[in-house]
Amino acid sequence: MALTNGRIEEYDIQNGYQNTEEIKKLPAELNFPVDFDKMPTFIFQEERQKLDLPLSDSEENQFHDFSDSKLSLGFEIGRSKEKFVDEKPFYSNKEPLKINSWKKSSSHPKSKEVSNGLLKVSTPPTEFVKRENAGIRRRSSNQGSFALEAPKILKRDAMFKESWKNKCFISPQKDNQGFSKSKHLSTYEGETENGFSTSTEEEEEEEEDIVSASWVDNLDMDMASFNSHRERFLTEHVNMDERSDDDFLLGLISSDSSVDDHDNEQDDVDLIGWECFFDDSSDELNTLSHQADDEGDTTDEETPELQNNKLLNLSTPKKSFGQTPRIKTELSESPNSQRTLLSAVPTPLELSAELAYKEDLTSLASRANISDNSTGLTPTLAKATLAQPVSTVVSVASFELDPRLNITQPKPPVMGTWAKEPNHLIGIIDGKHSHSLHHDKFDACTKGENTANNGYGPQTLNETSEEPSLDDILDTSLLQPSTQTDLQEENSVSFAQEDNSLSRWEKIPIGTFRKNQYIKSMARRDELIRDEWFTLAIKTREKRRHKINATGMTTTNSVPLRPKSRKARRALKKKARKMTFRQMHSDFQSALEDEHNDGSYLDNDYETVGLGLGPELSPLFEILESSGY
């Protein structure tokens, strides 16, 4: 395999030498084997500048496939008769190579030789270079000639610069005074020279702008590998539209982008994020209500818990403070009753901000003594109540527990179950569990029971019970509870008399309990969603397929028709084209029963008497024909 890096571009081997026939015989004498064990190491840009080595003159063999054990170095002889400016013959370690016989310019006493492992580079003295260049900045002023080069791998920046420079050789034409007038390009192929005159600055700009396409591809491949190994240092592409939507919902971007003043945040009613869906502008400027509400707010990470002070009935008694509530025996008998009461009773500091009662100190002291002696509370609770200073006890009112409230084991909700959590209970209305409304709830609020026996006064169910009731779900004003006597009468008559107490349940429409989650499009039928023409075409196509299969006609999976059947089918098609509107639909049933017809004439593209109906809808007129129209 001939290595194109070793091309030799010689303009005039000897002064006055013009015999080109003998020059063409030179390549046969220059083929010699190369030992790869003594190949040089990679030469980079810094080392190349130190050694003053020439660059490669071809870009397609920078990554050459050195598969052969022996390699022959060839060269090419240029046809230009003009002497190249800077000629630097090379020498090998194994002398002689018969290259010195071409030129004797290296015999200068001041020339120096530099060995790179394979070749010896002999450079002429600097006076020779300065005299030849004559102040013109050229590539050949600081680099060697393209005589015989070893395979090298250069850095990428050098490859960019040299890829275009190696395409051509620049040789000046000098006038009598020794100054160059114009420059000629002599290519490898030896084409005719095209002369043009440019300045050195324009030449440098052209050389920097023109980059070889092959090196651009290699650079793209290298950059792709660079990015794959360093993904963590590269920022991902972010779609600004999607990011702005997400930031708006998360509350990071205001809905009014023109508002940039953040000094008056309390006065700004402009909401951000999900607050737009829960707009309560009346409470925006009320800072006290926000502080009170922030204590009970929950985030996405924590689950909402039932506060302890909600277990108490906070409605003050209408009678005198001396009356004591009737607490169930289950509270005192249960082992956890003391701990539950201690945690459930609110502290005076919590209640002082909400309640402001201005009474005498004597009445407050007597109220504390009465609650200590007669309620049956533990001594620790009494001490905790009396241990507060007088200034804090002033704003504290007495609260009484609900006698029907069982803290240890709460009742199940009306329409669901309690989901047991490690810290609290959650009521779930699942529609599967239900409890008797009469025995559980309505026995406690019979007529006259609250006013006669209890010392409270009339109270509703929501005030006396903490579990959710029907009033929390829907309006139960028309739902009248039935008493125990009514139930006993119904059982004795064996349900002869119909109970109309729960007749309201029959009138509850579907979707009452999931009104906000109800999608209207789910209740529509597919025929209403689709277009009328689309639905009609589907029904007609299904009907036609059913009739074709019933009559035993040929289908696509059957054996192909014979020539006789094909001729008959073509005749039927021609006949169908000539048929009038009335004839075609009157003979439609007989045409389907014909054994030679497969109904293919319906697939032809023709309109039926200007009605705009396609062939698929033509079987619809069979109904009109059978009904007598």
UniProtKB/Swiss-Prot annotation:
Bias-annotated ranges (Acidic residues): 200-209
GO molecular function: transcription coactivator activity; transcription coregulator activity
Positions bearing Phosphoserine: S334
Cellular-component GO terms for this entry: cytosol; nucleus
PANTHER family assigned to the protein according to its UniProt record, in alphabetical order: PROTEIN IFH1-RELATED
Annotated protein name in UniProt: Uncharacterized protein C22H10.11c
Polar residues bias (residue ranges): 448-463
Keywords attached to this entry: Phosphoprotein
Region (Disordered) residue spans: 101-126, 172-209, 315-339, 448-468
GO BP, sorted A to Z: positive regulation of ribosomal protein gene transcription by RNA polymerase II; positive regulation of ribosome biogenesis; regulation of transcription by RNA polymerase II
InterPro entries, sorted: TF_CRF1/IFH1 (IPR018837)
